[in-house]
Amino acid sequence: MESLHYAIALSGGIGTGKSTVASLLRLYGFEVIDADSIAHRLLKEKQKEVVDLFGEGILKEGEIDRKSLGARVFGDPKERARLEALLHPPIRQEILQKAQKLEAKAFPYFIDIPLFFEKRDDYPMVNQTLLIYAPRKLQVERIKKRDSLSMEEIEARLGAQMDIKEKVPMAHYILSNEGNLNDLTQEVERLIETIKKDFHV
């Protein structure tokens, strides 16, 4: 597939504030393709196949309990690979279909892929990347507040991702999220100005 000229992969570790940045970018008029929302929908559509793989222990009131499934896959790379083998190809296909439509607008847009740097070989057509950065200590604090996970569960989730520091030299744009929402909004505004200049729009 040829390069997606206007695509910018939006990525960052768990607890870096990636979803907040995606929301702010939408407020400023940018399109954001959300890999997680595609994944959540496909998880429901492929419930039978997922239960066949992992058993009925991941169900709660007849539906997949994402916390139970997360505990299984984040604690075991083999289990995670099995889930990814089922879900990743259709997620990727849908992302690329949406991206092709947005290319026609000749305006930069974002593809929110949490594990973009880990899965970079699957997206060679995406040449620009935006990393949302926060130090690991801050990631842990935010995850504790938001997800009520144990320290063991937090470490398992962080361990399933490339260390945030390793991603820094791979990114074209880096947005630091170490302050409050007002600080982040100002960072996003500065970023938008840079992107508009770079894309001549």
Swiss-Prot record:
Catalytic function, reaction form: 3'-dephospho-CoA + ATP = ADP + CoA + H(+)
Main location: cytoplasm
Gene designation per UniProt: coaE
UniProt GO cellular component terms: cytoplasm
Name of the protein: Dephospho-CoA kinase
Organism: Wolinella succinogenes (strain ATCC 29543 / DSM 1740 / CCUG 13145 / JCM 31913 / LMG 7466 / NCTC 11488 / FDC 602W) (Vibrio succinogenes)
Entry binding sites for ATP: 15-20
NCBIfam families (UniProt xref): dephospho-CoA kinase (TIGR00152)
SUPFAM superfamilies associated with the record: P-loop containing nucleoside triphosphate hydrolases
Subcellular location, record wording: Cytoplasm
CDD domains on file: DPCK (cd02022)
Purpose of the protein: Catalyzes the phosphorylation of the 3'-hydroxyl group of dephosphocoenzyme A to form coenzyme A.
Pathway the protein acts in: Cofactor biosynthesis; coenzyme A biosynthesis; CoA from (R)-pantothenate: step 5/5
Gene Ontology molecular functions: ATP binding; dephospho-CoA kinase activity
